[in-house]
Amino acid sequence: MLSSILIALVAAGSAKAAGGLQGLLTVPETFPNLKACLSEPLTYSCENTTAIQNTCCSPTPGGLVLQTQFWSTYTGLEHKGQLLPKGSWTIHGLWPDNCDGSFEQYCDFSRQFDPAPSPAVLPNGTTIPAWKGPGVDTFVAKFKRVDLLDYMNKYWINQGAPNADFWAHEFSKHATCTSTFDVACYADYKKNQEVVDFFDAVVRAFKMFPTFDMLAAAGIVPSNKTTYTLDQFQTALKTQTGAVPYLGCGKNGTVLQEVWYFNHVLGSEQFGHFKPLDSTTKTSCSSTAGIHYYERTPSSEHEVRILP
C-alpha cells in the first residue's frame, strides 16, 4: 500500500501540482521528487537489516524520530501578542536520534540559521557561529506559504524570544542532521526549500499526537488544584497511541512540562508512516508524588481552533 502512496506522491511532486492529484492529494511544492526511492526496499528506520543505500529515502542514521511538545503556562511576550493556543500543547520539534539513543546536532554550518545556538560549543570543542541574517520566517514567506506561517505562529510558540528564533534553532540543530532534508535530495533545489519542507514535516508530525485531546479523553485536564499520577498520564497516552512516550517534569518531578513521542519511520520524514514506540528515555516525572498539570495564565492563551 505504501508503494502505491509513494508512487502517487512522486507523480504529484513531478507535476508540482499545488492542489495534488485532482485535488485528492496535496503535496507542498517544496517537497523533493522521490522517484529514486521507488526502487528502495521499504523498511522502518532502525529496523533495516542491510545498509540504507539512498539516505534521502529514510532518515539515516537518525532513524529514531521524536515528535516533541511543550506544556507552557506563559510566553513572556504576551505584551507583543505572542500567546499560547487554547486547548492544545505546543510544538517543540522533530528530532533525529540515532537508533541507539545517541544524537548529533548542528551538522551543517552552511545551513546554521540559529541566532543563539544552544549549545554554543559542540562536544568536540567546535564553536557554533551565531546566525546574523534574516529570520527563517522570511524563508517561508518567500515560498508564499502563508498557511504554514499562520499555523506555526499559533502552535509553535517560543518563550521569552520571537517564535522565528525557536524555529531556526530546531531546524539548525536537528534538521541538518536528518538525511531526508539534505540539499542533495532535491534535484531542482531552490534555496531554503528544505527549511520550509522541515517545517511542514514538523507540523504534520505534531498533528499525529494531539496531546491535550488525548489526555482530556481520559479525564485529565489542566488544574491548579488536582494532581494526577504518572501512571494516569502514561496509560492515557498509551491507550491513544499504542506506546508510552517520555514525560518530562520540573519541580522535582511534580510539574508536567513536556512529552516526547518516539517513532520509527517508514519512508522519509516528509512522507513517511510513523510507528510509535515506547520511550527509550526514563521519565523525569515522579512515580510516587502527585503531578501538577497546571492551568495556563488566562492572559497567556487565546482561542485558535475553529469552533462550531
Predicted feature descriptions by range:
Residues S72-Y74, P96-D97, G101, T178, ...:
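Solvent-exposed loop/turn segments at secondary-structure junctions
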Residues A36-L38, S45-E47, T55-S58, N98-D100, ...:
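Sequence contexts marking disulfide-bonded cysteines in secreted/extracellular proteins
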Residues P85-T90, C99-A141:
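Active-site-surrounding "flap" and adjacent substrate/cofactor-binding loops of secreted or lumenal enzymes
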Residues M1-G23, P308:
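Fungal secretory targeting signals
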Residues A18-P85, W89-T90, L94:
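N-terminal regions that are enriched for targeting/export leaders
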Residues A11, F31, E40, T49-A51, ...:
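Processing junctions and N-termini across compartments
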Residues K144-P308:
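C-terminal, well-folded lobe of enzymatic/effector domains
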Residues Y44-N48, Q53-C56, L64-Q67, D114-P117, ...:
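Extracellular/mature segments of secreted proteins
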